[in-house]
Amino acid sequence: MNDTALKDVKVIDLTQHIKTDKGTIAAVNGYAVAGGLERALACNIRIASENAQFGCFEIRRALPNPPDPLIRLVGFGPALHMLLSGELIGAHEALRIGLVTKVVSAQKLIPTVEDLAARMGEYPTGVLVATKKAAFVGRDMATE
């Protein structure tokens, strides 16, 4: 893709429906690539089944990829490897680099996520919102 073609590329925010003050959880079972990975990255917690695969396929299609969310989450080295290689990584590698917080069997994925969501739903909303905001402020201060 040349520079002229890039001018015609429109960025679509695939994560707009996820932006909320409340906690969000992604359950990943299967492939989370390109826009699917972007949606998972927009969630606060990512739990994967052992079947999950993650990748940045935009490089394969000569498309630009906004790297900031991935770099913030896993660090520069692992993010750059994913962005430039176009390779898939498995759930256990995703856990090792911090892309996901937990790996469970496919059969336990939905019950695990539902249990966590139920527990989070029991907490006072104001405390949950304040905790999330404080965590993001702390993260942003640490990266400045």
Predicted regions and their residues:
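A short beta-to-alpha transition loop/helix N-cap that caps and shapes the active-site region
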Residues: C56, G90-A91, R139
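C-terminal long alpha-helix characteristic of the crotonase
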Residues: I47-A52, V100-E144
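Well-ordered beta-strand positions
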Residues: R39, I45, H81, S85-E87, ...
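Short, structured loop/turn "capping" segments at alpha-beta junctions
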Residues: E50, F76-L80, I89-R96, Y123-V129
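CoA-thioester-processing core
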Residues: H17, A27, V33-L83, I97, ...
